[in-house]
């Protein structure tokens, strides 16, 4: 994969509440300098099968364009007791990246979502985990679950807290956009500034933007 190109593992298409078809989402990401992008539309038990449609769309793009595209899901606002079951079910439908909608401070996410996600090895990323606790961060580290620094308005208000604890406990931090609209995608330079704004030390920024997301992709044999 190229140097200083984006890897965004949390975006949405028309398969949930995003504005773009998967193909246009990927095309726009490619134009502004992405090496890889995951399409992780919202799911719960009512629509978990959408993972197979995302995978089908992604396969067409993978076969024809020079950008790594990954089918995924974001498990969103579900009873915490079914996170593990839904993660496994999403995998069976072709999802290669599993994000869970974490306890952002701007939505009424069910308490315990961060902890249950951290305990689930099938989960790759806890999206915008808000005021995640030290204990939850340690559990995430133990289970190789990454924590997200978010570029999305509102969700980003917890970035400083997530970065501080993540760095202290050695968590895998990744920076994603949670894109819903064309203007939500960002280039590498803006991602660098967002990471620094979360008080991530300059020497750690390349790990957050490149090394850590690549670890996730390598774990699943995607790259």
What residue ranges belong to the model's regions?
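Catalytic domains of carbohydrate-active enzymes, especially glycoside hydrolases
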Residues: 27-37
